Amino acid sequence: RQTGRLMQLGLEPEPFGHFHDTDGAIRFFNGLRNRSRRPELIERHLGLTYDTCHFAILREEPEFTLSAWEENNIALCKVQFSNALECRICGVEDLERLRQFDDGVYFHQTSILHREGAMLFPDLSNALAYGRDYAEEIRDSQWRIHYHIPLYASPEPPLKSTEEFIQKTHNFLRGRKGPQPHLEVETYTWSVLPDHMKIPLAAQIARELHYIETL
């Protein structure tokens, strides 16, 4: 009130969180508004943070998610630009390529899309164990891992990043009317990256910011 500045808290959906997908976030906010005597204050001061990595793992397109939240009067407080790691699994040797990212430090929620549908695991270690036990079922499957590889990274096939989610999100924001959300680069895995992906920290951060500025 003294400064006239609007303060908002952005809640961040994440796989295996209290709510983690587009519809779950909408149900959560509808529940808050329905129970509140002042729902307009919720809409003014409470909103969501959108992480491109999280929704790449959930396989929900940026335009679908961001449009749905907008249509339901949920404030978009912040957008976090981050990559997920993607891999096409053709055999056990591809699982071995992913083992280097099972660092034991962070949780790396993993989704597997195969011919029977999609599966979600709380950590890469769980997904790798499943892959070893059910090698035939996961043949020719697509894996997406909550592992924030640098925005500028171009891993060797069959590994790749989900940078198309960053590009689609950026394009959506450019066409969006009204106040824009706070933008943030969300890579935090510098200390646990495989050695061949590491460069000096200041150079890594500078390259990421340059990547966003030149989208």
Enumerate the predicted regions with their spans.
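Active-site capping/gating regions of soluble enzymes
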Residues: 26-30, 39-178, 196
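Active-site acidic/histidine proton-transfer and metal-coordination neighborhood
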Residues: 1-47, 57
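Aromatic-rich peripheral "rim/lid" segments of glycoside hydrolase catalytic domains that contact
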Residues: 189-215
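Alpha-helix N-cap and loop-to-helix initiation/capping positions
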Residues: 16-24, 160-165, 197-207
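Short glycine-centered, acidic/aromatic-flanked micro-motifs in structured strand/loop junctions
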Residues: 11-15, 50-52, 149, 187
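Conserved active-site loop/cleft motifs that coordinate metal ions or position small ligands
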Residues: 146, 180-187
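Acidic carboxylate-rich catalytic motifs and surrounding loops in phosphoryl-/glycosyl-chemistry enzymes
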Residues: 9-12, 82-84, 185-188
